[in-house]
Amino acid sequence: MSHVISVVSGPAATVELSAAPGQVTIVGSATGLVRLTGQLHWTGHAPITASRLNRVAGVLQLSYRCAAASPCTGNYRLVVPWRTAVVLHQPAGHVVISGLAGPLRITAHSADISATGLRTPSMQVAISSGHMSATFAAAPRHLAVSLTSAQATFRLPAGTGYAISSRVTAGYLQVGIPQVAGAAHNIAVRIDSGELALLSG
């Protein structure tokens, strides 16, 4: 079975997407609307879906969850105004992100994530059993990374120094960027098991 996804909303301060396993593309654009398109596929019972806009908080929540004992997958394309804050929960699959300039928070499991052209002032990432590569077009003020059985590579603009704090239980942290104690730009790293590379350029 399948179902077409089509959600169009006015601008929201934050868009929160809880996706079913599958492919997610998120694009920051010079648009005044939030637009989610795509398709859900499933076997058994239809996925549980919800779209809710909290106008007071300015939060648009988009949720797609497989029903019990009914495997499902999704293919999503989310286009947002480029300064919109984005929160993504991705249980498995492949994620491609480009052009975002608002705060970004990602929680993912068994996912391959690629992000380019980021101008986000802050990013929080928690990945288990997956991989992420991210390239920043502007230096983030705050970056927090948590890895469990995961690998990640972040490329940050040259010429900016960072205050870096880290806790590595099992794994490896490669620091190829300038470290400056007390810098306005800071990076917090927690690696329970995995590898993280912080590189310039």
Model-derived regions, located:
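A general sequence property marking short-to-moderate contiguous segments
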Residues: 1, 60, 141-142
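Short linear S-[DN]-x-LW-Φ motif typified by the pepsin-like aspartic protease active-site region
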Residues: 1-56, 77-79, 85, 97, ...
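Residues that act as N-cap/strand-start positions at coil-to-secondary-structure junctions
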Residues: 2, 9-11, 45-48, 72, ...
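Structural recognition of beta-strand segments within beta-rich domains
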Residues: 18-19, 69-72, 78-79, 87-89, ...
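Secondary-structure transition/turn motif
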Residues: 39-41, 63-71
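Extracellular beta-sheet/turn segments enriched in Thr/Pro/Gly and aliphatic residues
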Residues: 58-67, 187-188
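Right-handed parallel beta-helix
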Residues: 87-128
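Short, surface-exposed interaction patches in beta-rich subdomains
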Residues: 116-201
